[in-house]
Amino acid sequence: MDSTSETRSGSWLSVIALALAAFIFNTTEFVPVGLLSDIGHSFEMPTSQVGLMLTIYAWVVSLASLPMMLLTRNIERRKLLVGVFLLFIASHVLSGLAWSFQVLMLSRIGIAFAHAVFWAITASLAVRVAPPGQQAKALGLLATGTTLAMVLGIPLGRVVGEALGWRTTFMAIAGLSVLTLLYLARSLPLLPSQNSGSLRSLPMLFRRPALVCLYVLTVVVISAQFTAYSYIEPFAKQVARMSGEATTLLLLLFGGAGIFGSILFSRYSEAFPRGFLLAAILALGSSLALLLPLSAQPTWLMALSLLWGMSIMCFGLAQQSRVLRLASDATDVAMALFSGLYNVGIGAGALLGSVVSERMGLASIGNVGAALALAGLLLALFAALRYAEALKSTSL
């Protein structure tokens, strides 16, 4: 093998390692969804209160994403990535050892700070270390790692938690992170900071009403999603009366459907720009509205999870693509804002789901989420009509 081939092979291995890191980071954000009941049992707390872990985590990420990106913009990227992983690993060890819910929350805040920095720099790192002309494939691999977190990471985390205890799940994530860190530290070249953006980009972005509308739409629809999804594990067990194994399968089907959602996006989003996004929101709202009616039939509920998983993946990819194109001159800052606002939606949805669970009962989480999705659909229709020219100019 000549030196060029060796370099290219090494570059791809670095990209794959970054994709594995993406898998790990996305798994840990949502793995509590499959462990709420077990964590609540350990600390003698109701799942509605344990679910606030998701809210606090998401809001820390949302508040930290842009400031952390700006604070670290001059740090060499390999060194920064090592620091992020060390914080991530230490926080997971603390999660595994947590002797109180307060300590567990403190550890999750540490993980959230690491998450905020990781996603501010990883896409650009994957592009920079990819072989020449293979940047799009590198981003595709990164997206695959993210998708697999929903397909495999969360169900596997639940399986480990069910068999060995939820603390073991967090310790296993720490162990896998150590191995990933060792490889990345050895394989990545020195990567000086480039094109990291600045605060000067913010006023320019907020003077683009179509972009602002997309940001608001993201918060509304993601809030709808996580009003129900945050509590799907206790819903499946307490309302649908599903076994632990069936609940794990439900999560697996939901995550696996995301793969088909990404295929639908790649095939149809450009051909049907307006209709694709509207259809995704409509399918999401319908899935949430049918959650309670179909809960009496576990087979139908599992079938519904496929539509649900595809629709939220289609929505997320469509929104990300639109933001990138509407802010092609300030992508780092625009995507940091998108990531932050996406997490605002996660936190708001998890908080609303907690309130609904306590005051109206777990059975109502789907209906409340569906009402929010309807508001999102109306907003998307407004954007499609009001900002038709701006969206058309982005080929979306």
Swiss-Prot record:
The chain crosses the membrane at residues 15-35, 50-70, 81-101, 103-123, 136-156, 170-190, 209-229, 246-266, 276-296, 298-318, 333-353, 365-385. Keywords: Cell inner membrane, Cell membrane, Membrane, Sugar transport, Transmembrane, Transmembrane helix, Transport. GO terms for cellular component: plasma membrane. It holds the Pfam family MFS_1. It is found in: Cell inner membrane. GO terms for molecular function: carbohydrate transmembrane transporter activity. InterPro entries: MFS, MFS_dom, MFS_Efflux_Transporters, MFS_trans_sf, Sugar_effux_transptr_put. Involved in the efflux of sugars. The physiological role may be the reduction of the intracellular concentration of toxic sugars or sugar metabolites. HAMAP family: MFS_SotB (MF_00517). PANTHER family: PURINE EFFLUX PUMP PBUE, SUGAR EFFLUX TRANSPORTER. This is Probable sugar efflux transporter. It comes from Pseudomonas aeruginosa (strain LESB58). The lineage of its organism: Bacteria, Pseudomonadati, Pseudomonadota, Gammaproteobacteria, Pseudomonadales.
